[in-house]
């Protein structure tokens, strides 16, 4: 597979075309951002960990019947993926109150929800990624009603699979965000990544944060937290 021109560069990844029009190469960077790009930094080795962790979890989901864009890992930083048209939604599943949910609704961090809650936000940094409901998404023509139903169904399924897996690692999946895309035939698949950049992961016993919140909140030990969560994942695959 030949890597060709750079198609896109985002906050944490670069995307390249290949000699196959239906496949792309994603290259993970060590760059870190928070608060819609207002805070910037570098986390040494993050790109390697995020690439490998995301690939392991995508394969886990595929085995459980959840379609993803993953094709194969090329090297420690690069992965071959199916070309998709990204739907401009961030889909957030929350099992425990934290982050913006606690801030917006005045709920103390750590409160466990009776059932997982799903939020949609419009992917637009200039607008601050505002929250959307189904009606907003339909009005903006972000997706069809059937697509939104499919995304919601996949999101709940993914949450259940990941919660169960992380529990075996002594880790609590607090919340996480996902992106979905359309393949050429219109079918919906999970895209982007699943990593400590996109998930809140707490040690199940101590509630120590093992994710990008350590960078957001200047808690220190960011590289160690990423390495620890990767170590636990590899031990339980």
What role is predicted for each listed range?
Residues 2-121, 233:
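Active-site loop/lid in soluble adenylation, ligation, and acyl-transfer enzymes
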Residues 24-28, 124-135:
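Short coil-to-beta-strand
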Residues 38-48, 131-154:
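Short histidine-centered catalytic/ligand-binding loop motif
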Residues 72-77, 166-182:
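A short glycine-rich, hydrophobically flanked beta-strand micro-motif that places a catalytic Asp/Glu
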Residues 93, 173-192:
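Conserved metal-phosphate-binding beta-hairpin within the catalytic cores
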Residues 111-128, 159-170, 195-200:
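Phosphate-binding core of ATP-grasp and ATP-grasp-like enzymes
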Residues 142-174:
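A long amphipathic alpha-helix within ATP-dependent nucleotide-binding catalytic cores
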Residues 194-237:
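C-terminal helix-cap and adjacent tail motif
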